[in-house]
Curated annotation (Swiss-Prot):
Pfam families: HK. Belongs to the Thz kinase family. Its EC number is 2.7.1.50. This is Hydroxyethylthiazole kinase 1. Catalyzes the phosphorylation of the hydroxyl group of 4-methyl-5-beta-hydroxyethylthiazole (THZ). Gene3D superfamilies: 3.40.1190.20. It is an enzyme of class 2 (transferase). It catalyses: 5-(2-hydroxyethyl)-4-methylthiazole + ATP = 4-methyl-5-(2-phosphooxyethyl)-thiazole + ADP + H(+).
Amino acid sequence: MTSLKLLKEKAPLVICITNDVVKNFTANGLVALGASPAMSEFPADLEDLLKYAGGLLINIGTLTDENWKLYQAALKIAEKYNVPAVLDPVACGAGEYRKKVADDLINNYKLAAIRGNAGEIASLVGIDVASKGVDSAGVDNIDEIALAANEKFNIPIVVTGEVDAIAVNGEVVTIHNGSAMMPKVIGTGCLLGAVVASFIGLEKGQELKSLETAMLVYNIAGEMAEKRPNGHLPGTFKVEFINALYEITDEDVKKFKRVK
């Protein structure tokens, strides 16, 4: 099984093209975990960096026409160097323009995984689910949404919510770990996309196990952070979550994981 120890040993360079709100939080989270983030947004620089990268994150949160072109350029370069790319289609269910961009990136470029909340992923496959931009209401059929997207796009899918679902090659697992504090801190979902990009390329052909490990590490770190003094307060939780990502071990994952 793909392990946190393996990630720390490889310390993959992860290129994060993400939204302006979360860049600092994302970079610090990846460093704490053991990956090496680069927040580059210049195509010529990306050509140099992606030669050595272990993963690429495309997060469409701060969407502009210029950024759309940047996403396309980055994905072309990533495919050239066989770098696994993860798409976070932020708020793609909130409007036609975002949906158009997400559809373009999914249909015309090579992706290793898509990570989104239930509302975002449901919108990609035409399932009607209540969604509020980057947030999504509690959804009972999250595993069905993940499977529908996996079957439609033939791409590994991670759907997040009160329960998380991972679908790869028609197989679905659900993750029942996590903290209720996560949605109260802006950027936790976006950082998760970067964590997925850190794990997805560690072991070829082991995408399901890699994604499962990524989700467990992330969610159990959230549980650890919430249990610490004042972890029920969002400001403290944010700091303690970074600390927990730094301290969590494979033994913690084995002890506390809840997978179905």
